[in-house]
Amino acid sequence: WRKTPEGADRTFLQQECYQEIRQKRCRTVGRPCHYSAQCCSDFCAHTISNYYYIKRCS
């Protein structure tokens, strides 16, 4: 997992994925990446204390 400041999330996620994460509407792509995480495209992300924790889905 890579921790990134909330303001930097668009570097890692496409805009519509970012919006879906904020609205908790991401749909899982492929296998789930991690429990309680949302998967968009080939990324998996969840928020803790205003930080995004991001990794590639595999």
Curated annotation (Swiss-Prot):
Positions of the propeptide removed during maturation: 1-25
PTM description: Mostly non-hydroxylated.
Function: Probable toxin that inhibits ion channels.
Keyword Plastid among record annotations: no
Tissue: Expressed by the venom duct.
Domain notes: The cysteine framework is VI/VII (C-C-CC-C-C).
GO cellular component, one term: extracellular region
Sorted UniProt keywords: Cleavage on pair of basic residues, Disulfide bond, Ion channel impairing toxin, Knottin, Secreted, Toxin
Protein name, as recorded: Conotoxin Am6.7
Chief location bin: secreted
Localization of this protein: Secreted
Residue pairs linked by disulfide bridges in the UniProt entry: 26-40, 33-44, 39-57
Record GO terms (molecular function): ion channel regulator activity; toxin activity
